[in-house]
Design a protein with these regions (language model features):
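Catalytic metal-binding/acid-base residues of hydrolase active sites
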Residues: 35, 85-86, 158, 184
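Asp-based phosphoryl-transfer active-site loop
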Residues: 30-32
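Short catalytic/ligand-binding loop motif for oxyanion handling, primarily in non-cytosolic enzymes
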Residues: 88-91
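Short amphipathic alpha-helical segments
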Residues: 42-44, 93-94, 165-168
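Active-site-adjacent betaalpha module
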Residues: 1-28, 70-75, 97-224
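Short acidic, Gly/Ser-rich segments with clustered Asp/Glu that frequently serve as metal-coordination loops
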Residues: 35-41
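A short alpha/beta connector and helix-capping loop motif
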Residues: 25-27, 41-72, 76-79
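Short beta-strand segments at enzyme active-site cores
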Residues: 77-84, 180
Length: 224
């Protein structure tokens, strides 16, 4: 375990340990790639073949994300955001994969900003990344350790790429991960569901209302 040890260590083979409920003061919410360059009216019109994805974002991911942000902020949960954004204006610092794929959001560009519906508050943390997994190209692990985080809740897009990569890496680094299933999305429901099955050994999987209920119990217990 990391130096911020979780109190009750698991017995060998006790898979129920990853189902532990996140705890106040040791939990963060991470939002992945909900950025203007990937979700905007121009792109929606230009890519009608991704109609399912646009609908999933508009009707499920964004409204559920708003509910979750409200609950987390009210409970004092640390909120972090990560989007694809270069450290340079010309993109020379991008990963090879992003160069080959043509993924390019320059430093300080509007396209690299979080969408307005879920935008960070002034004192919340935004970490630009240049890889699928935020843990590969940033100092997010260092930041989470400094914040005393042991439980990491994850939402965002796309489920079977950057979200999945973050879940796997966070688990391998010793965080207890909760994937917010109905605050994530990808190009098809089939791809989304297949990913949930593939990574169930790396995380708890919960819906937004379940997590909000858990957070509500924290506040109730704190008030008693």
């Amino acid at each position: 375990m990391n130096r911020h040890e979780i109190d009750a260590l698991p017995l060998e083979g006790d898979v129920s340990f990853r189902e532990r409920t996140p705890e106040p003061g040791r939990t963060a919410l991470l939002l992945i790639d909900l950025q203007k360059g990937e979700y905007n009216e121009k792109k929606i019109k230009a890519e009608p073949q991704h109609a399912y994805f646009w609908d999933r974002l508009a009707k499920t991911v964004i409204p559920n994300g708003q509910k979750l942000l409200t609950a987390c902020r009210a409970a004092g949960v640390e909120v972090l955001f990560t989007n694809v954004e270069c450290y340079t204006l010309d993109g020379r610092d991008r990963s090879l994969d992003y160069k080959v794929s043509g993924i390019f959001f320059p430093k300080g560009s509007k396209d690299a900003e979080v969408i307005d519906e879920l935008k960070p508050l002034p004192n919340e943390i935004f970490i630009p990344k240049m890889s699928s997994s935020v843990f590969m190209s940033t100092n997010i692990e260092y930041v989470l350790r400094n914040l005393g985080i042991e439980y990491l809740m994850i939402m965002g897009v796309v489920t079977d790429q950057c979200v999945e990569s973050a879940v796997r890496d966070a688990c391998d680094l010793g965080f207890l991960v909760t994937l917010i299933e109905d605050a994530c999305g990808t190009m098809t429901q089939e791809r989304h569901d297949a990913t949930l099955r593939a990574i169930k050994g790396y995380c708890r999987q919960r819906k937004v209302e379940q997590v909000i209920e858990e957070i509500g119990r924290w506040r109730k217990e704190a008030a008693e």
